[in-house]
Amino acid sequence: MNAENNIPIIELDKKDTYLREISSKYSTHHYYDVSVCRESGSWRIELTRKAFASRLDKNYHGKLFEDHIEETRVFAAVLGNRQVGWIELGYDKWNNRLRVWQFLVEEECRTRGIGTLLMNHAVKIAKEKGARMLVLETQSNNATAISFYLNFGFELIGFDFAAYSNEDLEKKEVRLELGLKLQ
């Protein structure tokens, strides 16, 4: 299916959208192992793709239109009469970046180009806004998403070894920040 020609993208409104909470799950066989080594006068940080001993299944629950997001815009991909993918964007005026706060394609609709369609739409919105970069967060254990973002042109711009817990390194779930330069 060529999503570009067949799937409309609509903008949702906070006042009339039925969808406030979103849920997703993903399975992965790989992760990026993050190692941090402090040596005399320097830090050495490596991210190495490795295989889990067995498949990891993760569930995610989030909300759209959170109050803390500045200039929120939410878009949905519509297949037939059903919304099957969403991307939530927020503009960070202080550093002129557009952030992807939520990005989800329903599991049965993945690998059909819907994610690419939504991300292309986010790039269009970011350029219209004059943002210098499109940024997002993912986790080091979501190798499939990381591959998608890297293939799209995103690069690693940062990480947080304790974003979710004090044991993120041990859990193989390190917050990664990825960015796509637009200017």
Short names for language-model regions:
Residues N2-N6, R132, Q139-A143, F152-E155, ...:
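C-terminal "cap" of GNAT-fold acetyltransferases
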Residues M1, K124-V135:
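Short, charged, low-hydrophobicity "junction" segments
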Residues R44-R49, E107, G115, A126, ...:
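Alpha-helix boundary/capping detector
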Residues I7-E21, A131-I146:
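Generic detector of contiguous secondary-structure segments
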Residues D13-K14, Y18-W101, E106-E108, M119-H121, ...:
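Acetyl-CoA-dependent GNAT
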